[in-house]
Structures are given as structure tokens and as C-alpha cells.
Amino acid sequence: MYHLMLVCLGGAIGAGMRHLTVTAAGRALGTAFPWGTLAVNVAGSFAMGLLVEALARKFSVSNEIRLLLAPGMLGGFTTFSAFSLDVAVLWERGAQSAALAYVLASVAGSILALFVGLWLARSIL
């Protein structure tokens, strides 16, 4: 339960950071294009790569700190960072075909699922 609470705390911080970033980008660049979402996805993926490698090579931190930062804060900031890490892990393990299939299935499947959800909600409501 303690580990779950750490992930939740980090997630709350990350979600707040996401909101602030998306809001600031919308004010600065307009809302015709999702600049804020793009920014959090790219920045979150960069931060996930930096964090995972830094923790693995340079810094000895507890599992609790890892949970707070990676799935917690960065997961709340952007779930895209977790997806990007999954792709990188598959790729670096030599499973390039699986990594590419995962990218295609995730992107196409998520967009398709969104449209199915829209259709279902519009049909029911």
C-alpha cells in the first residue's frame, strides 16, 4: 500500500505539471494545434530516458524514489513516457519487429478505440 501511495503522490505532482505546461503552451502558442500535449509527451519521454539511465548508472536510490519519480511523477505528467520506455526496452533487447508492432498497435489501436468510444457515447447519449 505504501508503494501505491508513492506512485499516487508522484502522479498528482506530474498531473499538475502537465496541466501547467499545457495551459502555458496554449496561452503562448494558441490552441489550434496541441502544442502542450506534444511538449509533455516529448519532454516526458526525454525525462524518462534520462531518469532511467541516470538511476541505473550513477545514482543509487531506493525503490521508493524510483516509484515516486518514474511511474508516479512522469506517469502523471505523460503516459507517453512509459510507452516510449517500453519501445526502447524492446528495441534494445533486439526485438525490433516487436517494438515496431507495439508502436503501430498502440497508436492505431488507441486512435481507433477513441473513435469507437466517441461513437458509443454518441449512440447512447
UniProtKB/Swiss-Prot annotation:
GO terms for biological process: cellular detoxification of fluoride. Na(+) binds at residues 75, 78. It is found in: Cell inner membrane. This is Fluoride-specific ion channel FluC. Na(+) is not transported, but it plays an essential structural role and its presence is essential for fluoride channel function. The lineage of its organism: Bacteria, Pseudomonadati, Pseudomonadota, Alphaproteobacteria, Hyphomicrobiales. Pfam families: CRCB. Fluoride-specific ion channel. Important for reducing fluoride concentration in the cell, thus reducing its toxicity. It catalyses: fluoride(in) = fluoride(out). It comes from the Bacteria. One of its GO terms (cellular component) is plasma membrane. Belongs to the fluoride channel Fluc/FEX (TC 1.A.43) family. InterPro entries: FluC. Keywords: Cell inner membrane, Cell membrane, Ion channel, Ion transport, Membrane, Metal-binding, Sodium, Transmembrane, Transmembrane helix, Transport. It comes from Chelativorans sp. (strain BNC1). The keyword Transport applies. The chain crosses the membrane at residues 4-24, 32-52, 67-87, 100-120. It is a multi-pass membrane protein. GO terms for molecular function: fluoride channel activity; metal ion binding. The gene is fluC.
